[in-house]
Amino acid sequence: MVKSFIPLAVAMLFAGAPLFACEYPPADGVKIADGATATEAEMLESQQAVNAYRRKMEAFVDCLGREIEALEEPTVEARQMRNLRHNAAVGAMEDMAERFNVQVRKYRARLEQ
């Protein structure tokens, strides 16, 4: 068993697979409460979910950086792919923050009435 594992491990090492497995965090589990009707507890729960998503996305972006740094000589294509993935992650975080902030403004406007 061990003898068959060693050649497989060596083959995988030189197969060109990325050293890090940077997985894009899904946003589908993040629920943002409707600020027009939400309670304070629901808004705080939404804030916690958005912050948790942001932390996961920041870890993803950090992983992308480590992944490209691990390559001895990254190709132009590898750098471009890293930049695309990085920019998509930043855009997703900005979109999530804006969606949450819209609901916060609705919530605060409702409280001021």
Segments and roles (model prediction):
Residues 15-18:
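N-terminal signal peptide c-region/cleavage motif recognized by signal peptidases
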Residues 22-37:
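Short N-terminal segments immediately surrounding and downstream of signal-peptide cleavage
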